[in-house]
Amino acid sequence: MIEHVYRRTVAASLVHAALVATDDERIVRAVESFGGAAIMTRTDHLSGTDRIAEVVAQLPCRLVVNVQGDEPLIEPDAIDAAVAPLLDDATLEMSTLCRPLAGDHELAAPSVVKVITDLTGRALHFSRSPMPGSAAHIGLYVYRRDVLLKLAALPAAPLETLESLEQLRALAHGIGIRVIPTRHGSAGVDTPEDLERVRQLLAPHEGVPYVM
């Protein structure tokens, strides 16, 4: 699964390099086995945001794209769509993606994170609970480097802990998140059922190292 995520990420035209941040040596070996780059981090991070901040603190970059390892079908064009607004508007701090909910079953599913926005596309709230007028959140974030490092230094917010959603720390501390709608569906793997669905989608391509 990690190879699909990695190769789809580097295929995005606005991504210049990719690096897997992990605290598991097995993942490092897996990434290196297909020619990818990976780095070990501390084991005590509360979220992926905190983990990549440890790595980014050592790197010279302006923007950071956080593609979560459980998004094996993320589209390179969707990644570019999330990056582009921060290149075009210097006032934006963070961005992420959303897609239409597939139906009431997704609205009710705690594994499907929902997001609602204001009229400008700025996130108002993320939740695992049903919310009127919400869309399905796709687990990808783009940050300005300084915003990411600031965010990682802030304490966890009560709602972040309650919902187990790292992006709520940003909202709680007044960091704006632009939400970019996309029609590119992404099959995130959060449950055994999700994993089986992705396997079925990839089954026709068995033997191919990765599928675009």
Where are these regions (language model features)?
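Conserved alpha/beta core of the MobA/IspD/sugar-nucleotide pyrophosphorylase nucleotidyltransferase superfamily
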Residues: S134-M212
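N-terminal glycine-rich phosphate-binding loop and ensuing alpha1 helix
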Residues: M1-A21
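Conserved core of the sugar-phosphate nucleotidyltransferase
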Residues: H16, E75-A157
